[in-house]
Amino acid sequence: MADKQISLPAKLINGGIAGLIGVTCVFPIDLAKTRLQNQQNGQRMYTSMSDCLIKTIRSEGYFGMYRGAAVNLTLVTPEKAIKLAANDFFRHQLSKDGQKLTLLKEMLAGCGAGTCQVIVTTPMEMLKIQLQDAGRIAAQRKILAAQGQLSAQGGAQPSVEAPAAPRPTAIQLTRDLLRSRGIAGLYKGLGATLLRDVPLSVVYFPLFANLNQLGRPASEEKSPFYVSFLAGCVAGSAAAVAVNPCDVVKTRLQSLQRGVNEDTYSGILDCARKILRHEGPSAFLKGAYCRALVIAPLFGIAQVVYFLGIAESLLGLLQDPQA
C-alpha cells in the first residue's frame, strides 16, 4: 500500500465501503463468537457456532442474529477508514524512496494503525457486546427460573429456545452509560482493546503485504483483486486466531450484564487469572473459529475494495461530470 499515493477522502471512502459490506456478510458469526466467549465456568448453553445460531433464530427470530448490527454499521465506516488510512500513512512515512519496507517497519506501521482505530473500536465494541449477549443472558435466566419451578413439580427440561424478554437499544445503553459513568463508560475495556487490536494489526498488515506481494505478477504494478482478497483472508484469519485470548478477555471485561453464578472482573490480569483458574487454558480459544470466519472475509473484502480503488473511481466521476 505504500507504493502508491491515495488521497485521504479516497482512503476513508474505501475503508467505509469495505466495512459496511464486510459487517453485513459476517455479523451473525460475530454474534455467535460473542455468546460463545461469554459462556463461563463450563456452562454450555451453546455447544458450537451452528448450535448458537440455530437457537438464536428459534428464540429471537432471524433478525436476532443481527442484534447490535446497527451499531457496527454506523461505526464501522470510521473504524475501518481510520485503520486502513493510518496503516497507509505510517507505511508511507516509514518508506524511503519507494523502497520495500523492512519487517520491523511494517510491524510499526501496523502498530500505529491498531492504536489509532481504538478511538472508535472501543465504544463500538462496548455497545455491540451488550446487545449481542442480551439474548444469551435472558435465555439463561428464563431456563434457570423454569428449572427452579420444575424441581418442585417435576417435568421435562425447559428449552433454551424459550422467548426472551425485551432488551435495551443502543441509544438506551449509550444514555445509561453516559449518565452513570460519563464518557469513560463508553471506553470501558480500552486497555484490553489495545491489547487485542495492536498485536492484530502488527501481525496482519506485514503478513498481508508479503502474501499480496508473492501473488503479484512481475509485469504488473499491483496484484489482481483475487490475490488481494485471498491474502487478506489468510492474513486476517491468522491474526485473529493469534490474538483470540486477548479478545476473550476484552469481551468478558466489556460485558456489563452477567448470567447467574458468572464471575466479575476488576481488570485484565484478574480476568485472565480467573479464566485460567476456573475454565482452563482452552477457554482462551473460545470463539476462535468464529473469529477467524469473521475476520477473514472482513479483511479480504476490505483489501479488494481498497486495491480496486472504488473510491478513486467515484471521486473521479464527481470531479469530471462528463466522464
Swiss-Prot record:
- The residue range of the signal peptide is none
Q: What is its main location?
A: mitochondrion
GO cellular component terms given for this protein: mitochondrial inner membrane
Q: Mind telling me which Pfam families this protein's record contains?
A: Mito_carr
Its keywords, alphabetically, are: Membrane, Mitochondrion, Mitochondrion inner membrane, Repeat, Symport, Transmembrane, Transmembrane helix, Transport
**According to its UniProt record, which reaction does this protein catalyse?**
L-glutamate(in) + H(+)(in) = L-glutamate(out) + H(+)(out)
Q: Which GO terms describe its biological process?
A: malate-aspartate shuttle; regulation of insulin secretion
Q: What does this protein do?
A: Mitochondrial glutamate/H(+) symporter. Responsible for the transport of glutamate from the cytosol into the mitochondrial matrix with the concomitant import of a proton. Plays a role in the control of glucose-stimulated insulin secretion.
Q: Which family does it belong to?
A: Belongs to the mitochondrial carrier (TC 2.A.29) family.
Q: What protein does this entry describe?
A: Mitochondrial glutamate carrier 1
Native organism is Pongo abelii (Sumatran orangutan)
Q: What is the lineage of its organism?
A: Eukaryota, Metazoa, Chordata, Craniata, Vertebrata
Gene name per UniProt: SLC25A22
